[in-house]
Amino acid sequence: PITQGNRNPLLYKNIGADGIKTGYLAVERYSLASSIERKGRRLIAVGSGFETKSSRSRESTKLLTYGLTNYDLVEVNRSDKAIDKVNVWLGKEKNVNVYVNEDIYKTIKKAKKKLLKVTVKYDGPVEAPIKKDQKIATLRVVYDQELVGEYDLLSSKEIKKVNFLTRLIKSINYLIW
């Protein structure tokens, strides 16, 4: 059998790199797609046009180190966590918890963490009846004044409508007050 070592130089440095691919073309020169994983976060760096193998290794290491040093993976919300309560009109309950059905993470600059804003948008109160998992609001994620994500907010449970007499009283109350 023929044994051939891996040509990715980052695998042999003590930085934790675990892949991906080296290359060489006469036109593009040396290239490297590299990958590293730390604390559940994976960074991938791709570079080409390097004149030498050593510059390919050095610049790829710099790029991965820059990413690890200057960026964080921030948990915006977990799918099993209620985000907010939304007011319910004419329901047997006054409000309902809302949640997102997926975990939300964003990669942001460490120095700008305070620029990450999360808001709930809905036209409320929401009128009953409400079904479980019905979309009733939107979660907006803004980073550095740019919208980076919108997610459906779903009701955590079913809310039934109050009976006719209660609806009538609440409606009259609303009109008077």
Question: What kind of feature is each model-predicted range?
Answer:
Residues P1-W177:
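Domain-terminus/edge residues, biased toward the C-terminal soluble/receptor-binding domains
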